[in-house]
């Protein structure tokens, strides 16, 4: 189901902040998120359950938790303000909700970059059915 959703979004043309998040990830890792992170482990992609499989999957778990704490807007819609300054992502703008979404995305993109060396292709295209352990709390 999560793969179908990701493909549907990709085919529609990614709008708003999902495109921005993709760009952040590419700038920090050199990887295209839709390919590398849309169906990785138990948490990267649509939904999530179980125990994160590795450090990269934990980045997605933390990102999901961060989105869960955002109030006042839909974390997957809208457009936020950000820039790259000296290799760092800097979130801006006046809307506190969109700024919070940007911060969630910034932290995740940095986390992916910090864990590039441990990215394991065996978790790419893994099935969420394999994520049977009890989910952690945020």
Swiss-Prot record:
PA2 catalyzes the calcium-dependent hydrolysis of the 2-acyl groups in 3-sn-phosphoglycerides. Belongs to the phospholipase A2 family. Group II subfamily. The keyword Protein transport does not apply. GO terms for biological process: arachidonate secretion; lipid catabolic process; negative regulation of T cell proliferation; phospholipid metabolic process. It catalyses: a 1,2-diacyl-sn-glycero-3-phosphocholine + H2O = a 1-acyl-sn-glycero-3-phosphocholine + a fatty acid + H(+). It comes from the Eukaryota. The active site is at residues 63, 105. GO terms for molecular function: calcium ion binding; calcium-dependent phospholipase A2 activity; phospholipid binding. Binds 1 Ca(2+) ion. Its cofactor is Ca(2+). Ca(2+) binds at residues 43, 45, 47, 64. This is Phospholipase A2 EC3. Residues 1-16 form the signal peptide. One of its GO terms (cellular component) is extracellular region. It comes from Echis coloratus (Carpet viper). It is found in: Secreted. PANTHER family: PHOSPHOLIPASE A2 FAMILY MEMBER, PHOSPHOLIPASE A2, MEMBRANE ASSOCIATED. Disulfide bonds join 42-131, 44-60, 59-111, 65-138, 66-104, 73-97, 91-102. Its EC number is 3.1.1.4. It is an enzyme of class 3 (hydrolase). Its main location: secreted. Gene3D superfamilies: Phospholipase A2 domain (1.20.90.10).
């Amino acid at each position: 189901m999560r793969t179908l959703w990701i493909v549907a979004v990709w085919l529609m043309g990614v709008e708003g902040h999902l495109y921005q998040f993709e760009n952040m990830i590419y700038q920090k890792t050199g990887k295209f998120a839709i390919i590398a992170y849309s169906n990785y482990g138990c948490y990267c992609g649509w939904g999530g359950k179980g125990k994160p499989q590795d450090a990269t999957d934990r980045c997605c778990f933390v990102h999901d938790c961060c989105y869960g704490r955002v109030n006042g807007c839909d974390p997957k819609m809208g457009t936020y303000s950000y820039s790259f300054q000296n290799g760092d992502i800097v979130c801006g703008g006046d809307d506190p909700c969109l700024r919070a979404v940007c911060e969630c995305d910034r932290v995740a993109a940095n986390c992916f970059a910090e864990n590039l060396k441990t990215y394991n292709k065996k978790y790419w295209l893994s099935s969420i059915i394999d994520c049977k352990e009890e989910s952690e709390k945020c």
